[in-house]
């Protein structure tokens, strides 16, 4: 395989490691590194070989084609899209027309014969690996070609030639210029690998870090049916999974969140073999769309491999994987440094200050907001229509589009998931993108003004009109010490990993209502009595509960995922989860809810909180919440999760709810379980010592306490100006509660809106000796720093 005793033209993966990047590029060096070092640790990589940078440079040198290439590039205006396209096409044709040197062709022939082992049906993947590719500060995502299901030596040779030419794709030329790479300093290596038969199973991409927030305690996995190109290109909306690393390391169930993608199409082997037609795209049968493309066990196994790879490289990694449909075995087919989050950024908080009509929604990429004029682009020929500040709307972006993507204020696509090329490039460029909207190109019209928001969690929204938004930047490394803990109020698990990156000392209020409303959306009684519902409602519920075995499991499973996400995001800090505090009108708004809820004149003071939990009409619904908490604490081991009981009206009710929790397997003190009570009714403060006999502490709910102390309806605009937590009567009640808790040596914090809105109120609470303030995430840093100033 050597060239007359000089440097080799072809090397096997098991001869390679990361010190060979300059010889075979980042992608091939990484595959060799894993085969050499991680095979014995459960990481499986298909065998293969790589042509070297020397082979590529000799190929260009032999005919003088390199001189023509660099002369043409030097006089091409890269920012002129048509000039770039013309030059790129000319260079690629020159390369394809240039024959391989005989030494290289013979070296590839020898390696191919050994790799195929005379198997006539063997199929191969031929991939590019650039010598500057996958450096931690430059994502060359998808800038060179990949050929799949290549069969026969002649076809492999043609594919290698096309891979060589792909170093001069328009997008690769543009990218090198903008990243400051010299064309002359970059060479290309072709990797030839045995194919994993994922056309008969599933494949996808995973990151050893959360791609949106940079939170590093989870593995993020995407998966769809068939060959992985559909996920990488963004042609499908894949399934998504988050796996918590510490829970995985403890040998416990560690999947904290699952989202089912539509997975409408897949790439499979084509029956007839022609160059460029080795694969075809087909529709996925409905029954396969409606199930997850990986089992929970496979998700955990992939996550273990991701952790092994990350630990070996000592940095966050971006990994492509494939499942073999014949054997069921999981393989790693690529691994490279994760490039966006590993750069480190100043913390930015985008906040939308208005709500408009929602035109489209999909998966949010990043956390930014952009606004501009819609340009619907149907194909690459329309690229020159994009002006700086436009919102690019298209079916799916190809990596060829990178030169125009950087002009856009935002990007919106019909197809794609959070690990596709469009997502990776959008993150790198710092442009908000909403992918996988389904029909954005039909719903959004050329010339209309829109706002694209990725600042509201996993779901990204496109709103009509240019809405007002702001951005705050902060780069606080260490926070000053305070005599109390600054915690956070969090309702949306989608934002948990993002919020966990803020300075914090845990979660003082995690609300279940958001999970029930957004992740479930069905009344628990309608699920427990599913067989009694009419056919239309049953069909609606079946559509909502795809991926779950039963209506009951849907409710418990989704609650478990939501609570586990919150617990994992802040682990090992305490996360106080308040059990459901919907009022009857809010429960009635859930699917199937009207049938089961009373009509109350004032639901705020009606059937809610602890009284609901112990009522015969709701006990078995409450049991579903308890089951979810038990799974999170006992099965997953997230014992940092504590529970909080809202709206406990009487001491007898306190006793009854503690007994009910024990009956449901949540016994105070068992497995370290702490049960906190919301102190939000004047009776709670007046009889604080008696209530505290049944609980491990208080969390003050200043919203309800204020309205009940002052006799106000906080939802009424007529009396809203009188609502003030700083009123002396309210403060007197809070002082009573704080003193009682201190006297018994029990926890007392606050999770109401007051300290987030009024820094003077927060300062008063600190002087009163409160153990913790739980604030809205957007006020944490400012309030923390302000209180520290007061203590100086």
What are these regions (language model features)?
Residues 112, 120-125, 130-140, 144-148, ...:
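Conserved alpha/beta-domain cores
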Residues 1-191, 200, 286-297, 302-305, ...:
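N-terminal beta-alpha lobe that positions the nucleotide/phosphoryl donor
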Residues 218-318, 323-324, 363-370, 388, ...:
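Conserved catalytic alpha/beta cores of large enzymes that bind or transform nucleotide phosphates
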Residues 214, 450, 704:
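Small/polar (Gly/Ser/Thr/Ala-rich) solvent-exposed segments
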Residues 142, 314-339:
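Conserved metal-phosphate-binding beta-hairpin within the catalytic cores
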Residues 66, 338-343, 347, 360-364, ...:
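Acidic, glycine-rich flexible loop/linker segments
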Residues 138, 148-149, 159-160, 202-211, ...:
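Beta-strand scaffold of nucleotide-dependent catalytic cores
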């Amino acid at each position: 395989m050597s060239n007359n005793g000089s440097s080799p033209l072809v090397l096997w993966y098991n001869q390679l490691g990361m010190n060979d990047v300059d010889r075979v590029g980042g992608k091939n060096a990484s595959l060799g590194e894993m085969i050499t070092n991680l095979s014995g640790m459960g990481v499986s990589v298909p065998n293969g070989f790589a042509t070297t940078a020397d082979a590529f440079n000799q190929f260009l040198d032999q005919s003088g084609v390199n001189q023509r290439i660099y002369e043409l590039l030097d006089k091409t205006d890269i920012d002129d899209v048509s000039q770039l396209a013309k030059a790129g096409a000319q260079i690629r044709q020159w390369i394809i027309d240039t024959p391989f040197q005989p030494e290289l062709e013979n070296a590839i022939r020898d390696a191919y014969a050994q790799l195929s082992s005379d198997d006539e049906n063997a199929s191969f993947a031929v991939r590019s690996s650039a010598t500057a590719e996958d450096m931690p500060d430059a994502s060359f995502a998808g800038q060179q070609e990949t050929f799949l299901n290549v069969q026969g030596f002649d076809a492999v040779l043609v594919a290698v030639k096309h891979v060589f030419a792909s170093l001069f794709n328009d997008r690769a030329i543009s990218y090198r210029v903008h990243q400051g790479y010299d064309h002359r300093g970059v060479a290309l290596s072709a990797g030839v690998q045995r194919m994993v038969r994922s056309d008969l199973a599933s494949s996808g991409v995973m990151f050893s870090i959360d791609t949106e927030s940079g939170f590093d305690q989870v593995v993020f996995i995407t998966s769809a049916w068939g060959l992985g190109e559909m996920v990488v290109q963004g042609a499908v909306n894949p399934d998504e999974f988050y796996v918590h690393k510490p829970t995985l390391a403890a040998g416990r169930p560690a999947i904290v969140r699952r989202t089912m993608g539509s997975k409408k199409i897949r790439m499979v082997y084509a029956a007839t073999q022609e160059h460029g037609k080795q694969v075809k795209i087909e529709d996925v049968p409905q029954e396969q769309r409606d199930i997850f493309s990986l089992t929970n066990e496979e998700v955990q196994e992939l996550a273990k491999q991701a952790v092994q790879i990350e630990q070996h490289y000592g940095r966050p990694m971006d990994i492509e994987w494939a499942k073999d449909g014949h054997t069921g075995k999981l393989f790693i087919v690529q691994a490279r440094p994760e490039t966006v989050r590993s750069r480190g950024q100043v913390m930015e908080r985008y906040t939308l200050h208005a709500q408009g009509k929602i035109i489209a929604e999909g998966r949010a990429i990043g956390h930014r907001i952009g606004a501009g004029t819609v340009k619907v682009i149907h194909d690459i020929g329309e690229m020159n229509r994009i002006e700086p500040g436009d919102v690019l709307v298209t079916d799916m972006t190809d990596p060829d589009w990178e030169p125009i993507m950087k002009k856009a204020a935002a990007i919106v696509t019909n197809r794609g998931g959070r690990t596709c090329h469009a997502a990776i490039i959008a993150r790198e460029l710092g442009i908000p993108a909403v992918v996988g909207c389904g029909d954005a190109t039909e719903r959004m019209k050329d010339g209309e003004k829109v706002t694209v928001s990725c600042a509201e969690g996993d779901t990204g929204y496109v709103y009509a009109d240019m809405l007002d938004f702001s951005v705050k930047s902060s780069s606080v490394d260490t926070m000053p010490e305070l005599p109390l803990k600054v915690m956070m109020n969090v309702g949306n698990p989608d934002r948990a990993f993002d919020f966990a990156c803020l300075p914090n000392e845990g979660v003082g209020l995690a609300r279940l209502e958001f999970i029930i409303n957004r992740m479930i959306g069905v009344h628990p009684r309608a699920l427990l009595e599913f067989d009694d519902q009419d056919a239309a409602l049953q069909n609606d519920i079946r559509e909502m509960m795809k991926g779950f075995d039963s209506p009951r499991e849907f409710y418990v499973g989704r609650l478990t995922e939501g609570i586990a996400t919150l617990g994992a995001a802040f682990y090992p800090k305490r996360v106080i989860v308040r059990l459901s505090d919907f009022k009857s009108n809010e429960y009635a708004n859930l699917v199937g809810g009207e049938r089961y809820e009373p009509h109350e004149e004032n639901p705020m003071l009606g059937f809610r909180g602890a009284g609901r939990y112990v009522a015969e009409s709701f006990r078995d619904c409450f049991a579903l919440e308890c089951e979810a908490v038990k799974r999170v604490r006992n099965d997953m081991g997230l014992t940092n999760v504590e529970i909080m009981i809202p709206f406990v009206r009487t001491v007898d009710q306190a006793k009854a709810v503690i007994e009910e929790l024990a009956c449901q397997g949540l016994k105070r003190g068992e497995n370290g379980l702490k049960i906190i009570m919301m102190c939000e009714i004047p009776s709670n403060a007046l009889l604080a010592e008696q209530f505290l006999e049944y609980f491990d502490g208080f969390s003050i709910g200043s919203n309800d306490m204020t309205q009940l102390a002052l006799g106000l309806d906080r939802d009424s605009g007529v009396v809203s100006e009188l609502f003030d937590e700083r009123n002396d009567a309210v403060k007197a009640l809070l002082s009573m509660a704080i003193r009682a808790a201190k006297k018994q040596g029990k926890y007392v914090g606050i999770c109401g809106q007051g300290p987030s809105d009024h820094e003077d109120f927060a300062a008063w609470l600190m002087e009163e000796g409160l153990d913790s303030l739980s604030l809205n995430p957007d006020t944490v840093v400012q309030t923390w720093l302000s209180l520290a100033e007061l203590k100086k």
